[in-house]
């Protein structure tokens, strides 16, 4: 990107945040509407330029993703690139039978073990859905437990309900040897899809994000706008919305 492109993106982002805004503000944020930091315009919710500027100045451009052994970490900063897994596949190819079948807990365990032994993969973002557990709360907890038991590398997962976050945090505290130890070196983070393109907040996902911050679990905020469909067709416009 040229300096001109960067300036256009910055101006576009600030315009979207302060003038266009978002739909469906979560209830817990409604109390912050004060026409200064969070502003309501035509049933949409915008952010004040002062708040935007304050956030930009406070952002950390070096983030550490820790591992369980506390001896190594991933430094997310300029020039560093890492590869890992990802996705949420409900099916897996059964290599011996040459057919696809529902993914199970043992498959997630094996996938995490493989990643743990591969030097070219630096983190484990759960790639499979546990179809052998029907309860969403238990499925999210067991997904994390299985992943953490099979790899020392940083684990990324997700939860469907904000009430699950506390239970997940307690598991992490137990593994780390205490809450303070986990907060100092969090070896698990959550993928949260908090936006429904274009520019609608997902209330449930925002609740998950709030609980994650409360319990010291790092958050990776995912945005899935599609160029020309749920976001502008131009690269600059799509990046601005994202």
Model-derived features with residue positions:
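Helix-rich catalytic cores of soluble enzyme domains
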Residues: 102-242
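Acidic/polar, glycine-rich intrinsically disordered N-terminal extensions of enzymes
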Residues: 1-106
């Amino acid at each position: 990107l040229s300096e001109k492109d960067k300036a256009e993106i910055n101006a576009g982002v600030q315009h979207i945040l302060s003038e266009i805004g978002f739909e469906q503000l979560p209830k817990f944020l409604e109390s912050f509407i004060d026409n200064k930091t969070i502003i309501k315009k035509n049933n949409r919710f915008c952010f004040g330029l002062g708040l935007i500027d304050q956030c930009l100045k406070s952002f950390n451009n070096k983030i550490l993703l820790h591992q369980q052994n506390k001896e190594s970490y991933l430094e997310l900063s300029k020039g560093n690139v890492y590869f890992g897994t990802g996705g949420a596949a409900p099916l897996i190819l059964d290599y011996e039978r040459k057919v696809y079948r529902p993914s199970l807990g043992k498959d997630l365990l094996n996938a995490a073990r493989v990643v743990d032994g591969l030097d070219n993969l630096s983190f484990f973002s759960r790639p499979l859905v546990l179809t052998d557990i029907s309860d969403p709360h238990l499925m999210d907890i067991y997904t994390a437990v299985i992943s953490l038991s099979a790899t020392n590398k940083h684990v990324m997962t997700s939860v469907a309900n904000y009430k699950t976050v506390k239970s997940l945090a307690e598991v992490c505290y137990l593994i780390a040897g205490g809450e303070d130890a986990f907060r100092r070196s969090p070896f698990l983070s959550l993928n949260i899809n908090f936006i429904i393109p274009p520019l609608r907040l997902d209330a449930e996902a925002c609740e998950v994000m709030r609980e994650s911050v409360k319990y010291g679990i790092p958050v990776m905020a995912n945005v899935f706008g599609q160029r020309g469909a749920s976001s502008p067709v131009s690269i600059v416009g799509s990046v601005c919305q994202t």
